[in-house]
Design a protein with these regions (language model features):
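Charged, gly/pro-rich active-site loop segments
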Residues: 8-11, 90-155
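A generic structural signal for short beta-strands and their flanking turns/coil linkers
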Residues: 27, 42, 51-53, 71-75, ...
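Extreme N-terminal tail/first-helix region
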Residues: 2-29
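A short, Trp-centered hydrophobic/proline-enriched beta-strand micro-motif
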Residues: 21-36, 75-79
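Structured helix-beta-strand junction loops
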Residues: 25-26, 71-72, 117, 127
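A short mixed-secondary-structure module that forms the rim of ligand-binding clefts
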Residues: 47-85
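A short, aromatic/hydrophobic, helix- or strand-capping loop or linear motif
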Residues: 35, 79-82, 123-129
Length: 155
């Protein structure tokens, strides 16, 4: 994995660990999709794979969100650790994960991963009217201290 910071590539091990920590600590993300060139955002409960290549979330199939994602598979997701106070200007980290999304089978491994983070969402996940979605991350753009921006290519 290569990390691009200010036009230069560097080792991604430290940044990857910071990203893993954020992904494990945060329970919610803002999912952005679009329809007819209009953006649409939602909060979703998510879980990421250990290698950070995939982000999983659940949505009812009868929603606008599901319809938009199945017609245009390109989405992005923002995960952050802001606390809504002035310390955020120096301490907050925000991550944008971009890629393509698909509905996937509710396999034992993915269910275990998702419910390990969100055990209170078992009924929602297991409902026949819910779809398990997988975002295959193309890249992460990581912003910290509002000016330090790093890009992590996952391909």
């Amino acid at each position: 994995m290569r990390v691009k910071a200010g036009g230069f590539y560097m080792s991604g091990s430290d940044m990857k660990e910071r990203l893993k920590s954020l992904m494990n600590e945060q329970k919610l993300a803002v999912l952005a999709s679009s329809h007819k060139d209009e953006p649409y955002t939602n909060l979703v409960a998510f879980a990421s794979s250990d290698d950070l290549k995939y982000i999983f979330f659940v949505t009812p199939v009868s929603t606008r969100k599901y319809s938009y994602m199945t017609s245009s598979r390109k989405v992005s997701m923002m995960i952050d650790n802001r606390s809504n106070n002035e310390n955020d200007f120096k301490d907050a980290m925000a991550v944008n994960a971009s890629g393509s999304v698909n509905e996937v089978e509710k396999t034992d491994a993915i269910v275990k991963l998702y419910l390990g983070k969100h055990p209170y969402l078992r009924d929602f996940l297991e409902s026949p009217s819910s779809a398990l979605m997988r975002l295959e991350v193309k890249n992460y753009i990581i912003a910290s201290r509002f000016q330090n921006v790093v890009e992590m290519d996952m391909k």
